[in-house]
Amino acid sequence: MQTVIFGRSGCPYCVRAKDLAEKLSNERDDFQYQYVDIRAEGITKEDLQQKAGKPVETVPQIFVDQQHIGGYTDFAAWVKENLDA
């Protein structure tokens, strides 16, 4: 599964999401992730809203296999429910 984390520097929840994704990628052969710094890439809130298909107010915004999961708390819950990590 391919996970994309849209975040920014200085965001503690972005760091947590990246750390969890790194842990999963080290433990599982079927998990890969990409971290995208929205400031460095010039991605706007409107761009994220369009990709998510709904309003977004915070980062990180996380997608698994192109499905919008939400922020860090949503991602951690998704991992617990789907991957037992």
Swiss-Prot record:
Disulfide bonds join 11-14. GO terms for molecular function: disulfide oxidoreductase activity; electron transfer activity; glutathione disulfide oxidoreductase activity; nucleotide binding; protein-disulfide reductase (glutathione) activity; protein-disulfide reductase activity. One of its GO terms (biological process) is cysteine biosynthetic process via S-sulfo-L-cysteine. InterPro entries: GLR_AS, Glutaredoxin, Glutaredoxin_subgr, GRXA, Thioredoxin-like_sf. It comes from the Bacteria. PROSITE patterns: GLUTAREDOXIN_1 (PS00195), GLUTAREDOXIN_2 (PS51354). GO terms for cellular component: cytoplasm. Changing residue 13 to F/S/T: Abolishes AMPylation by YdiU. Keywords: Deoxyribonucleotide synthesis, Disulfide bond, Electron transport, Nucleotide-binding, Phosphoprotein, Redox-active center, Transport. Residues 1-85 form the Glutaredoxin domain. Changing residue 14 to A: Partially abolishes AMPylation by YdiU. The modification O-AMP-tyrosine is found at residue 13. Belongs to the glutaredoxin family. Monomer. The disulfide bond functions as an electron carrier in the glutathione-dependent synthesis of deoxyribonucleotides by the enzyme ribonucleotide reductase. In addition, it is also involved in reducing some disulfide bonds in a coupled system with glutathione reductase. This is Glutaredoxin 1. It comes from Escherichia coli (strain K12). The gene is grxA.
